[in-house]
């Protein structure tokens, strides 16, 4: 199975080499100012254009807030299935993507197949797949594409961006935490947390 990546954004061509370093053979690049900030409409139009043109068997999207938004819009437009929050993926001998995800409140695991439509689409939770060793010497093919989309064609306008990302000593990565303790305003103060 050949691995390809889609890179969409504004001045993001440098990310193509990163994709090659982690195993992509091809990168489909859409690089334009209209993609500067994530908005559903331009991104899903770009992905749908690429899927309709190149006909991939499988499309995987990270199960992040933005990834879930994008994958849902793309699957709806393409009239294909989408398995959300997969915790396991495999390809069987008939080239079906075996998409495993928790069901019924996490009490059982369900394996889902998309038999009749293409592409087979999944959003994938973090840490489901092993990260391959980075090989900066790997090269691949960049396929530049564009769609005739102007800023005035997009219904949602970005008026202001407020950066809420902390860096340095203030940064907290809860995705890597083994235990997270949380409480609401009813706790009144941190002193009321007794573990």
Where are these regions (language model features)?
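N-terminal glycine-rich FAD/FM-binding segment characteristic of electron-transfer flavoproteins
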Residues: 1-195
